[in-house]
Amino acid sequence: VYNPALQHKLHELVKSHKIKDAKFVERFTANIDDIQSHFNAIYGNHPHAANLFQSLLNSICQAFVDRSDDLKKRDAQKEKKGQWFLSQDLVGMSLYVDRFAGQIYDLPGKLPYLQKLGVNFLHLMPLFKSPEGESDGGYAVEDFRVVEDRLGSIEDLRNFQSALQKEDMYLMIDIVLNHTSHHHEWAKLAKSGIKEYQEYFYMYEDRRIPDQMEETMPEIFPESSPGSFTYDEKLDKWVMTVFHHYQWDLNYTNPKVFIEMLGNVFFYANLGVDVVRIDAPAFIWKQVGTSCQNLPEAHQLLQLIKMCTEVATPGMAILGEAIVAPAQIMEYFGTGRYATHECDFAYNATQMAVQWDALATGDVRIMQNAQHELLRKPLGATWLTYTRCHDDIGLGYDDYMIEQAGFTPYDHRSYIKNYYSGAQPGSPAKGALFAVNPKTQDARLSGSLASLCGLESAIEKNDKAAIQTSIDKIILMQAMSMFVGGVPMLFYGDEAGYTNDYSYLNDSGKSYDNRWMHRPIINWERNKSVSKKGTTENQVYTALQQLIKLRRSLPIVADLKNIKWLENHNNSIAGFVRYIGEEKITCLFNFSSAPQEITWFIMDSNGQRPAQVKDLWSGESLNVGMDHDHLGLAPYQFRILK
């Protein structure tokens, strides 16, 4: 509804900030009513709501004024491309700066290595100041605008962004919205007794409300950090600490917190970040009597952030790191009239987990059962697809998906956990259980891609056949991530077949967290082996290089909501069709350790059966048979048929 008073306020703001950009005014005009309605829905009852809303509008204008001409030009180029992040051209890598290269200053020297592989989108793991020994890998932030000394400076980051931009590469960094370190300036001011800053966090005089809340709040780290509240002696209060005791949860019922954190989002946008990764968005709103995850207000806050960035910094996309149940993940793309106006990206954690499930069992039915949820993703948003990342693997797919495949959920998950943690006799995988809950026996999994695929144990045994099988598994897993829809994100070290790194056990700041086993320190002498034929590193690297090249050559794999999963004709073979109009490719993946066959009837899906197809991966030409004829796939083989 047109609101003359609000439009007048907008024009006064634009005038006072001396903004003459017609496109900015157009975007602001289109969004201001929704910005106000979302703000009022959350904060309308706050005694200073009107003044704080004015502060919010000012911060949007100021962010645009602060945006460089270069970035505004890049915004316009992205707008011209349309939804640039849906393209098949994007292939990413996630990395820790120190463990990959040393410092930010050293990263430009590593770009040729990444470009040779085909990577053009970098996710730099947390960069900002966090206390040594209490950093949670950089997710306990002490200062959102100061780069960790050992990594470099903001100037180094700006220079690196410029280097990426010159190479037409993209940058993603994290913002931790849910919490800060207890050494953050706001936490220090709260500890000093300043009430205004105590209201930036959740603090309680006694255990009454914490006890109530803990009845319904799941524990995140039950082993290393049980409970969701920590007693602070200096304050003589209980502080909400959902993750670790040194991470204080921010109180978003306080609009000042929202405006401050939005300012940090804008700061990152104006560094030239192409995608901001919002860590743990599911947790940002808390309410007694709930799990304090995935609440409606959390979505309203994310939508409000998206609207504000669409106005001031429109070239920056948002990734919501919501590792939640399959049905709930869809909500992070926005619902109803806000579909595709919340997060542009979400991690396809369900697809990642069901791929690991299929690899352990040789049975793809659970993967197939998950697809009707995943196919609900709206056109215009996309997945970030991956096989491994810095985090653990959670088996978060729904029980009914397991039951429909004929398995018992508890027993099935126990099998998967045992298979990958080395407790299952005969399993080649080498990983470990993470965050075991002694009450429920729930647990997640740590381990590198290569070690979970059996490479570590095969090398230990010097078993050449097992080494080759593990490489085949690695490439199978990566191939599915390349073609299943979304932007594939590799994890550093995986491109060279790095196995688990156990050096974390000797570091008191890391030894309690076995996820560090799959966060290697790159040995660049070893990485020279990616160019030496016959090495494991070379086999993995060159296969990935070829996969990326193939992906990039196929506009049909851009994420245009153009995927159709094949009906089950073999419990070990997952298959889907990617299509644009009459054009299609059929992708088949054998998750079994044995050769498998599938009927040529699959070629009828999405159009008339061709007489001949070419496997774009192997280069093989194949004559298409009748329904009673079968196409063969070797163990862990995949085919991309056109």
Where are these regions (language model features)?
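Active-site and adjacent substrate-binding regions of carbohydrate-active enzymes
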Residues: 1-642
